[in-house]
Amino acid sequence: MEDINIVIAGSAGEGVQTVGDVLVETIAVHGYSVFAWQEFESRIRGGQNSYSIRISDKPVNAPRMKADILLALNEGACNKYEPLIKQDGILIAQKKTRERMIAIAFSEIAQRELGNRIYINTMVIGALVAAVGMELEVLNHVLTRKFAKKGDKVVSDNLVAAGKGYTLAREGCRGICPWLLPKLDTHYTPIAGKEALSTAAALAGCRFMAAYPMSPSTDIITILSQNEKELGVFTEQAEDEIAAVNMAIGASFAGARAMTATSGGGFALMVEAISLAGMTETPLVIILAQRPGPATGLPTRTAQGDLLFAINAGHGEFPKLVLAPADADDIFKKIMRAFNLADKYQIPVIVLTDQFLLDSIFSVQDINLSQLGPTYYLTDPFKIQDYKRYLVTDNGVSPRLYPGQATHLVTADSDEHDSHGHITEDLSGTVIRMVEKRLAKYRALKGEINPPEEADIEGADKILVGWGSSRNAILEGIELLREDDIRVGMIHFTELWPLPEYRFPESKQYWIVENNTTAQLGRLLRSEYGITIAGVINRYDGLPLTAGYIRRNFNG
């Protein structure tokens, strides 16, 4: 089947997210893959927001901009988003304004026939289910489950509202709606990036999170707080980002796997503490959820502008790990890897996400969570006679105990220290050994870094190179470019520092694809690998990369 792209648009407070969430669940229960992402302004009421839903019988995990169906809840939304409608697409709105559209007076009908305008959203969902040719019975099942705790009358009233919207849309669809989506036996689970990340952190053994709210990272601590009993992660909303990161370091020193989360501005405040974790060799995981900057920037939009900032965060020289998951599936793997390697090498780990990755809803199949489990590296205190917290070893990793674990004295200091953790200024010996010990951890860590993913490299003379959340858009962009007879492949990084030992294929032209203005990955690869960059495809308007954008802006 051809993918179907639905855009639901309206003002903040009109229920755009509610409509989208219920529709996503209905599509998944129907057996189809769904990808959804939201575009919204930085305000609680007003403005115009959208919720885009892409439906397919094949796995889809990337956005498309053009709409097969635009449902506009108000005139302003219609004016803003109508240009997105494909030539053969349709508009669903309250008033007739064009030929290919379904006009349904949702507000008037909800008030007159259902007794309350509150049922507008349920009517809208019913109309969309009808427009794409799905079964009303499946929607009724989803609504019954959603409203079950509110009583039989609420359930009944919403089923009536959904049926009304469904019937009216079916009548309006005649001759203009070509879609028919029968129920399939396949099973997809829709999950938002932030839900995947929160769940993955708990599975990785995280037991403490401190954070100060900053979009787009805020939902992580919200989800963990709301599910504290189920997930077992204690959360603390700190007074600021400096307190949050230091709480996480303290919890880790005390023996708990710990993390914090923030965006660019908050991360700037955390940088000194990252050096503290580097010097005290305390495991720490920081989620850096990127948004456009500088300063406050665009709090509800997406970007990849903090790559070099993350790699270079912290004064002095010490090992750190920087990861950037590509999608929901990869989030589970990278978060587990972040906590395990932070523990193994006793280092800070920065996980680069962004608004698009966290807020988007992905379809996943057959995630075997039982295969995901933490590996702990705390030392057995009963195997140690003379405990030296900073014992010099071949790979730089020293024994690590937490206070109270045994009778051994556990110390740490942000000053340069000796093997016992006591302050030293022995410049001729101890200081050099400690610096070289930390450097040895960097070399050992570098040996564990996975190479970038390669796709369609053979036979391609041009290679698109990206990182993090750009992966699926690049893969779809390759398909479109090959339709234009352009032989193109992909190299994609999700482990960004230390960079892996990797040899770029020769006789290729490399194009950097990033959600920033300065092609930061390109600058990094040029300095570390010496490759020549043939061109760049940058997007920096706050919207995510799409296959169509890549195709339009590739001029190789």
Predicted regions and their residues:
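Flexible, low-complexity linker and terminal segments
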Residues: P190-K194, A202, F339, D343-G556
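Gly-rich Lys/Arg/Thr-decorated short loops/hinges at beta-loop-alpha junctions or inter-strand turns
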Residues: F147, E171-T186, A201-C206, S225-L231, ...
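Active-site cofactor/cluster-binding pocket
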Residues: M1-A204, F208-A210, Y502
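Short, conserved loop/helix-junction motifs that constitute active-site signature segments
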Residues: E82-D88, G278, D366, F504-S507
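Short beta-strand segments
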Residues: A72, I92-Q94, T262, V285-A289, ...
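Peripheral docking tails and interdomain loops at the edges
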Residues: A12, S107-A110, R117, I125-A148, ...
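A short helix->loop->beta-strand "cap" motif at the edges of active sites that frequently abuts
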Residues: I85-L91, V233, A256, T282, ...
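Thiamine diphosphate
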Residues: E2-M65, I69-C78, E82, F208, ...
